[in-house]
Amino acid sequence: MKQAQVLTKEEIKKVIKVCELTKHADRNKLIVYLSFWSGMRAIEIANLRVKDVLSADNEVLDAIALNKTQTKGNKGQTVYIGKALKKELAKYFAKFPRIAEAKQSHLLRTQKGNFTSITIQHLFKHLYTLANIPNATSHSGRRSFITELSEKGVS
């Protein structure tokens, strides 16, 4: 299977800029940030719940503990939240306080209900098409994140 394309910093900025032109700009940017800034897979983003990222006193957590039903491979994992992503999550909850109140609900929703890994993949395809990045996939964010960490010497 062909590996997902790694995006340059300029291409990532282009995708974020394209998000700003969409109807649900804040939500779409958060999805892009979760992929590119934490390396989360589409299925993990789709399965995120508010309680996974917010404490009982509405503070953004330093790490997301994903259980085995939320991940690929049927085993749990911890996703660390960097400063930039933490700031974006806090801004998102400040702008949409009703989302923060519904701790058991999915973090990201469509008008028809919860996202699925397939709808996340379709959203990425749409955003990459708008940004004129034809070979990128929903996995490009994860691959770009991991490649950047590797280049910085993180193992």
What are these language model-derived features?
Residues 47-76, 80-85:
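Conserved tyrosine-mediated DNA breakage-rejoining catalytic core shared by Y-recombinases
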Residues 52-57, 134, 154-155:
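Short, polar N-cap/turn motifs at the start of nucleic acid-interacting alpha helices
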Residues 70-90, 103-124:
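C-terminal catalytic core of Y-nucleophile DNA break-rejoin enzymes
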Residues 37, 144-155:
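C-terminal catalytic core of tyrosine-transesterase DNA break-rejoin enzymes
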Residues 1, 48, 114, 134, ...:
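Catalytic phosphate/metal-binding cores of nucleic-acid and nucleotide-processing enzymes, i.e., regions
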Residues 1-13, 110-111:
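Flexible interdomain linker/hinge and immediately adjacent N-terminus
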